[in-house]
């Protein structure tokens, strides 16, 4: 590969990283050179620190659990834990992901401080409660640290359920998500009227619309 091209790519990446740090999107507590140290971020509602990088499971863990696929994903998960990873996020929407993840967690013991996060993605109070319990059983964990309302689906109903679960100590954090830019306006309205610990929405180099209103709103709401 052309060395000049590599240098240019690296230079662009470093400029982008510096820009993100400048607007507060990257707030590392250590330098990248400190291999053993974790780069963390504070959860505003509690003060708890989490590693800046977590493990997502959409598509990558949605596989047929044959020996080869499970072996490959097992290597990934083991390396993640060995490097200090603790945050894993999934959803019932992600096909086989929760089942595959749970099978792997039974083979590869997670760290004691595993931050298990999933979502509720259905309609109705009882269906939501049943789905969240099913997710817990698939994962094989005692409980979740975070449950988010996936893509705003029946959010008013699930919000009441999740806030009750939080007050009872069954979960630690409540969040809401959307992966669709067309729903950003509704998400803004929800965030203005209801407190959440976490919010997740589409934001990337190709789609920076969230910079105008969603990111400032999320920062203002803590």
Where are these regions (language model features)?
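N-terminal export leaders
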Residues: 9-26
């Amino acid at each position: 590969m052309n060395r000049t091209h590599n240098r240019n790519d690296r230079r662009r990446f470093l400029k982008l990283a510096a820009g993100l740090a400048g607007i507060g999107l990257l707030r590392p507590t250590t330098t990248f050179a400190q291999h053993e140290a974790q780069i963390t971020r504070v959860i505003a509602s509690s003060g708890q620190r989490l590693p800046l990088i977590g493990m997502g499971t959409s598509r990558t863990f949605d596989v047929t659990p044959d020996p080869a696929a499970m072996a490959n994903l097992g290597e990934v998960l083991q390396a993640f834990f060995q490097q200090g990873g603790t945050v894993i996020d999934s959803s019932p929407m992600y096909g086989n992901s929760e089942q595959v993840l749970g099978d792997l967690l039974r083979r590869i013991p997670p760290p004691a401080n595993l931050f298990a996060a999933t979502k509720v993605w259905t309609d109705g109070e009882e269906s939501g409660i049943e789905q969240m319990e099913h997710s817990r059983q698939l994962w094989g964990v005692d409980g979740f640290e975070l449950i988010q309302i996936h893509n705003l689906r029946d959010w008013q109903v699930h919000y009441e359920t999740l806030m009750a679960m939080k007050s009872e100590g069954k979960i630690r954090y409540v969040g809401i998500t959307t992966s669709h830019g067309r729903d950003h306006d509704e998400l803004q309205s929800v965030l203005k009227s209801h407190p959440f610990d976490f919010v997740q929405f589409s934001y990337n180099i190709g789609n920076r619309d969230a910079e105008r209103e969603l990111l400032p709103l999320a920062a203002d709401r803590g």
